[in-house]
Amino acid sequence: MRWKHKLVYVEWVDASQPVPEWHFFSEIEAGVPVPCRSVGWVHTYNKDILMILPAVTGMDTEHRSGMGSMTIPRSAIRSITAIEIEENYNGNT
């Protein structure tokens, strides 16, 4: 599937948050990957990364703009699902 400019739902895993205190190695417990879910319009999809934007405007013009870009390593992605949207919005884009 060609993903460029598609709205997608992504399930991926991230590193768990670092523990801020010092501990002896013998006291440290293994963390677990954190399951994450994100929704956004695809800006970049290649062999290394998926970049999505949660907010976009002007998608039908040469002045496309987006904010809040998130880059997810492809190795962290568990699934990508295209979201179909109805294109009958009556306001400005």
Where do the PLM segments sit?
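Conserved RNA-binding domains used in RNP assembly and mRNA/RNA metabolism
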Residues: 1-93
